[in-house]
Amino acid sequence: MEVAEVESPLNPSCKIMTFRPSMEEFREFNKYLAYMESKGAHRAGLAKVIPPKEWKPRQCYDDIDNLLIPAPIQQMVTGQSGLFTQYNIQKKAMTVKEFRQLANSGKYCTPRYLDYEDLERKYWKNLTFVAPIYGADINGSIYDEGVDEWNIARLNTVLDVVEEECGISIEGVNTPYLYFGMWKTTFAWHTEDMDLYSINYLHFGEPKSWYAIPPEHGKRLERLAQGFFPSSSQGCDAFLRHKMTLISPSVLKKYGIPFDKITQEAGEFMITFPYGYHAGFNHGFNCAESTNFATVRWIDYGKVAKLCTCRKDMVKISMDIFVRKFQPDRYQLWKQGKDIYTIDHTKPTPASTPEVKAWLQRRRKVRKASRSFQCARSTSKRPKADEEEEVSDEVDGAEVPNPDSVTDDLKVSEKSEAAVKLRNTEASSEEESSASRMQVEQNLSDHIKLSGNSCLSTSVTEDIKTEDDKAYAYRSVPSISSEADDSIPLSSGYEKPEKSDPSELSWPKSPESCSSVAESNGVLTEGEESDVESHGNGLEPGEIPAVPSGERNSFKVPSIAEGENKTSKSWRHPLSRPPARSPMTLVKQQAPSDEELPEVLSIEEEVEETESWAKPLIHLWQTKSPNFAAEQEYNATVARMKPHCAICTLLMPYHKPDSSNEENDARWETKLDEVVTSEGKTKPLIPEMCFIYSEENIEYSPPNAFLEEDGTSLLISCAKCCVRVHASCYGIPSHEICDGWLCARCKRNAWTAECCLCNLRGGALKQTKNNKWAHVMCAVAVPEVRFTNVPERTQIDVGRIPLQRLKLKCIFCRHRVKRVSGACIQCSYGRCPASFHVTCAHAAGVLMEPDDWPYVVNITCFRHKVNPNVKSKACEKVISVGQTVITKHRNTRYYSCRVMAVTSQTFYEVMFDDGSFSRDTFPEDIVSRDCLKLGPPAEGEVVQVKWPDGKLYGAKYFGSNIAHMYQVEFEDGSQIAMKREDIYTLDEELPKRVKARFSTASDMRFEDTFYGADIIQGERKRQRVLSSRFKNEYVADPVYRTFLKSSFQKKCQKRQ
């Protein structure tokens, strides 16, 4: 078998290739992989390998029924129209036998089907029904002991450098994971951690369907996902690594994104290549095994892999050792940040290099004595908390932070009856991951090998790894820090809206000429945008800046027992609940609160406007006579304010409700600094998917039709009305952009045009299908409104608005205008009835943000707007002894009380072997060490913790924290110890829930009031007193009362 040298790339169509090696070819994994890439297999991002018939990884699978799946996950899917979000809920542990019975039961079994195409249709049609259960992330291998060919536990690739040089084991990444699937269990769209290779072998059972997107088109999928899920995208630039996003093939086809699909049968391998996005599902009960690996070609991908920045538990591997060992000629340049390299996705990996050969030779010498030696890794089990602070150790250039994730144990019963616990931290390759502990009976201990060296212990986290990677669960998981390098700017498809600076806001005293504002089509450039795509930008072919050395040595993983460095890759989503609302839901309107509806007299009575947000709109209400000059003045003024686009401003209001009226007035009275006279481009804030509400519109064009390649769009101003918009937001084709450009309204000389969806004039208008006009921002935010022509934002369809919405009254303008018109939107918080016009809410400063499909905009009224800094600032206030404060009494009401003493308590933070976490463990509860005398143990040290149930649990120590407790005394003399966050000073504003239950202590006439515990226990329950009206009818005989009671119960049963 020769590695072909080809000048032109093979496999130009990027189709998934299938290989059938002979036994001789099959013996050398790395050599055959290089051969596959020489044929162009890597261009598809996925390839199938059918091993020789005589090769068997395991002779019999009948003895794994007692294998324990410690943390199965139930996959709940929400969404519609080919766009879905997957949530994972952890279930009780079960054995493989129990799981198989469940998978084959009537509820979860595979439906009848004609062929795989028919089954695929049924999968996408029924995806949101009957949430399946997935047995994922079981750390270990079920290969037989003597199998050396393509043994997933020891592939002997360059990724092994991580464990050999740094002593770090990342479970699921460089150790194998087992996965037990059933019909419809899914692994969502993702690439591997650090964009590594992965290998997946289907041991037995029903097939598995795969979808793959060529690496050279990966960026297109990312942009599409950013458009459909803007909220997730703004929260994390690499949100696809959360493995929660499902996009159907029909949607990919409509957007022209190339993809291919293939079915993996039992006994076949699937290999994914660097930066190859893939997804898929199981046809029924099966068992697969997978892990990650690497080649020399991967190193350049690893340098620029886009990492998840919103969680601490994502895998991040320091590339320093790989560059130093396998790219020594580029090492110094790379350390200096000058190693700029363009990734060629078509280039195959070399069969070998001098550096790889030298490394393999050294490795063989070391491994000769223990070539076939594998032992179980010990792990710790323990409950885990949702949030933990990072604690790290420096180990051979690797930073080992405190695992934020939950670990589960794999227990293997050895013949010596010694139980070995394995921790499952983060899953890595092709299967959805779930933190897992599995128990193997004594007769199984001879057949199941656990990956790892004798000196290393495995860690098992509660993270779930998707089918071919990891999935998300509802619990928090151990954290492998994935923070992006500080020196490399992160760029995302959408920028988080900046808050307008008051100095930029201005309101001219008199209407000015539009020519001064629209002189050059009003374009603005954002100066802070990076010109080079960086570490956070993924694998866009072209720029690959090097990472400075300061960050390269930060391979962060959870610390492991006995000084070994071990971690597992984790892909579970943080605790969150699936959306329970419907985009079309209307909430019955009630009287608005005083907080949201100030009593303001009608402007029509020419009374002076007192609200700062409404002052600039005084001449724009539709009940006033049309005033085109006032519209020009308003449009010209807001064109100078960020975001400079009359449509994007939906997500960045000009008015700041938190500011004083004087501040807001000053912003509008500030003079214009200077008029923009040079063309420029900025990134629109409104994602393209907000314009495409239903899948019906998807066929019109791909997203961002009028965007530049870098995601920016030209800002252009109308020569007459001075409104400024992005070309992409307003739908302006490039051939129409010119000096003197006119908006749709000015082209038709519709000087008196007004929006049919609100009560305000001005802004960017487009014509509706019934020949009226509507603000583009109103059409985006009102759920039932559609753009018939999405790219050009024309032919707005307002005919689907229900009567209930048209009857809603705006809390902002109902006292300013006499008529009820337009269509209101409502707060997205629960069933909040607050309603308002889009432009009224925008002018008043109501927070609106892009939401994930199938929702458009997430709206938060003032009542539900949370300021995260309020509570933290309150907790910073010092409380002293003798101070009068307010806190909760035992009777659940709040009273004034006096601080009698302030004490501090040191708590230890430990992670148990099962992955759970405790932040409030007392030092004396650690029985394996006298912490009161010797002090705390070393970070990462294994300890024994005595739990309140009296049992001892294994755990790892991760740090300590100090909590202050306040002993307070109420007027009735009772005392209680409270934390700072439960105490309010007299000068703090009390939350509503506290105000509602705040009381003033009375005399001791009602003693029971101050003994809530007794009341709850029922010891002081008030006796019932018989009414005088029924004294003559009361029978004291208990036998008679029992007879009546039994007779009554019999009568009730007969009626039922």
UniProtKB/Swiss-Prot annotation:
Broad class of the protein's primary localization: nucleus
SUPFAM superfamilies: Clavaminate synthase-like, FYVE/PHD zinc finger, Tudor/PWWP/MBT
Residue span, JmjC domain: 144-310
Domain named Tudor: residues: 877-934, 935-991
Biased composition, class Acidic residues, residue ranges: 386-397
Binding site for Zn(2+): C236, H242, C308, C310
Protein name: Lysine-specific demethylase 4C
Protein species of origin: Homo sapiens
Source lineage: Eukaryota, Metazoa, Chordata, Craniata, Vertebrata
